[in-house]
Design a protein with these regions (language model features):
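Tandem repeat scaffolds
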Residues: 4, 8-114
């Protein structure tokens, strides 16, 4: 059974859907950890987002502009980056380059190295 991305009712998710990265970052700074797993981020421009300690597990980033984002402290298990723009993205060190290439090229879900 295929997983379908959610359109999350969370206010922080809605800010990203509306393209308000600045307000997202301001509100996120007041929180310890943000849970946005299983969400649909397809076709969004997320440049400038503070992604530290954000749970993006099982999210769809199809054709999403992620250029320059630091994802090194984000949870990305099962996320798909099909055709995403990833120039300058810092991925978690536990996700291998081949995993990222497969996800961007073929839409596979990323797995962490054990």
């Amino acid at each position: 059974m295929a997983l379908k991305p959610l359109t999350h009712p969370d206010e922080l998710y809605q800010l990203l859907r509306e393209g308000d990265v600045k307000e997202f970052n301001l509100r996120k700074a007041q929180l310890d950890r943000i849970k946005l797993n299983d969400c649909d981020f397809r076709y969004l421009d997320l440049r400038g987002i503070d992604a530290q300690r954000v749970d993006f597990r099982n999210c769809y980033f199809h054709n999403t502009d992620l250029r320059g984002i630091d994802l090194s402290q984000a949870s990305l298990e099962g996320a798909s980056f099909n055709s995403a723009r990833i120039s300058g993205v810092l991925f978690p060190k536990d996700i291998g380059a081949q995993e990222i290439i497969l996800s961007v090229t073929h839409g596979t879900r990323v797995r962490y190295l054990k």
